[in-house]
Amino acid sequence: MTQLYRIGQIVPSSNTTMETEIPAMLNARQAIRPERFTFHSSRMRMKQVKKEELAAMDAESDRCAVELSDAKVDVLGYACLVAIMAMGLGYHRQSEKRLQQATADNDALAPVITSAGALVEALHVMKAKRIAIVAPYMKPLTELVVNYIREEGFEVQDWRALEIPDNLAVARHDPANLPGIVAGMDLEGVDVVVLSACVQMQSLPAVAKVEAQTGKPVVTAAIATTYAMLKALDLEPIVPGAGALLSGAY
């Protein structure tokens, strides 16, 4: 009998990409592995990518975890990297523990992944030491993200802030622009390129091109989240066409 897994997604209300890129990867996996997935979301309000609005949104994440645990999902993914990183260094650990406890208190214990924690873990898995980052945020928020990742033990050699404050506009950013952005960055000695430090910024269509262009492994927040979900479900973390991390090399 085919095993079916319920994927729970804690989603900013204005996010339109998490529910396309993560299902796209897991659905692509179905062509090469027997497991099947369904996708279930709960939303927390956010329209402008500003620190105050992100903090207010994060306060709603507990409700989302409880709602998704009502559906007895098998894993939960919190998809707003900057909301977690803007709350303070190492906050992904606190968030994951609290939200998992919320599922346990609802008699539906399930592992909780944050895209922030997933990206940090992915960089460790890929044995990255020196990285480059592309993010859609305004510079002050991007600096918070860069500092957060540095505190997790990585050297950030170069980074780009695309300075898009409206979250819907982030989703509309054309991923075809990403290879050109990366071409202007200093990648000398870089181990891994973080092509999108944001689950809302589309990047999946550009991953293979940037890997070919740079000769370096490329990861994104969405790819890292998908990897972490598969690991949490004790499934082989392999997805065709989703970059080095999900190639089976790790």
Curated annotation (Swiss-Prot):
EC number: 5.2.1.1
GO-annotated biological processes: catabolic process; protein homotetramerization
Keyword Isomerase: yes
Catalytic site positions: C80, C198
Pathway this chain belongs to: Cofactor degradation; nicotinate degradation
Catalysed reactions, semicolon-separated: maleate = fumarate
Gene3D superfamilies per the UniProt record, alphabetical: 3.40.50.12500
Keyword Signal appears in the UniProt entry: no
Residues recorded with modification S-(2-succinyl)cysteine: C80
Residues annotated as binding substrate: N15, C80, L81, V82, Y137, N167, V199, Q200
GO molecular function annotations of the record: maleate isomerase activity
Induction pattern: Repressed by NicR in the absence of 6-hydroxynicotinate (6HNA) inducer. In presence of 6HNA, repression is alleviated.
Keywords: Aromatic hydrocarbons catabolism, Isomerase
Record's miscellaneous remark: Reaction is initiated by nucleophilic attack of cysteine at the double bond, yielding a covalent succinylcysteine-like intermediate.
Function: Catalyzes cis-trans isomerization of the C2-C3 double bond in maleate to yield fumarate in the aerobic nicotinate degradation pathway.
Protein name according to UniProt: Maleate isomerase
